[in-house]
């Protein structure tokens, strides 16, 4: 009996090892096999979105004494900087929105330092929407449904205690105690409230993005968080973010993604109701959600968006983050990017919007010291940065990509990723900013 048990364990281990080896070989092989044979870009009527915009950090920079220049012109306000981006061909502004409502005196959340504590608040978002209305440029809201921040590495549940009418819908329960149906009641009401407040500033919203790098969760139903929707999520270790997309994406589909789809759909429904109540035409309003690609294979990315559709979330665009210099599944980041776009086009029937993109013009350090991968043909120089930016746009325009947002172009703490180099809080444009994005 003991021998049989040992044999079964050995067989299981051998089988598991074989499966892992096959997956690894498949990934390694796929890195060097790139072909467009049989590929057709998805058909879309959407105009290409040159989404260069002031970032969530720009207002803080000006408050802290930062200035910029371009071709001899001095720039001392967020409005003038956005005007520069419009002159360079930008077709929309951007705003990231957390559920935290007001700016507080310290960057602290739950007793810990939080650099996102005071850059994504509702109040700050409304000010950017007012600026978009003044400049007569559409704005793309990113609705995180997280208290201060979320991305592929970190998720937070939303908090609505600063919104009495929304908080009352929780009926005295903590967010982690709510069922999926109870969560969606609140999310729908929040979507409606938020959209009404934004649209009443007079701005135009043609595209709504729900979630930020939502690979592993949204609105509290997330890997590592306690939730009554799926109690097993709370005990999942962080390293599973790097294993599940590779070895077991079906686990993500069955334990996170299918629930998130219902949450996204609730927010979407609330947003569209706001258009109806305000008498604003919603015919051309579009929705997207974006995920990080560095932890995904092209096939896993396509499975994510198909899971959303299968479970009731209708989106018009698949959003992705693309950081070529970051560690990723592929040695050649451009091959990963291109194969991901083509997989989403072919398997999901969706165009792709690159919601976050940047490339370093020099060595990265500090928190981003690991983001120094050099892509072949694109050295980490100003020229290499500019060429990468241009080539991503040019390839994308013929391959089902309907827009690119250069992320945080004016943010000094982004290291060499930005499109300005800084001297004593003064931003001087790099080569990449000299390009005319309108051409």
Regions found by a protein language model. Give the residues of each.
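N-terminal Sec-pathway targeting helices
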Residues: 2-21
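Boundary/entry segment of secreted carbohydrate-active catalytic domains
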Residues: 32-91
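Hydrophobic faces of well-ordered beta-strands that scaffold small-molecule active sites
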Residues: 50-60, 93-95, 139-143, 206-210, ...
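Acidic-and-aromatic substrate-binding clefts and catalytic sites of carbohydrate-active enzymes
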Residues: 55-78, 98-123, 148-151, 215-218, ...
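Short, acidic/polar
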Residues: 62-86, 187-197, 296-311, 386-393
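Aromatic-rich peripheral "rim/lid" segments of glycoside hydrolase catalytic domains that contact
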Residues: 66-73, 224-247, 252, 339-343, ...
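Glycoside hydrolase catalytic-domain groove-lining segments
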Residues: 81, 142, 258, 269-287, ...
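Substrate-binding cleft and catalytic face of glycoside hydrolase catalytic domains
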Residues: 87-256, 263-279, 283-286, 362-364, ...
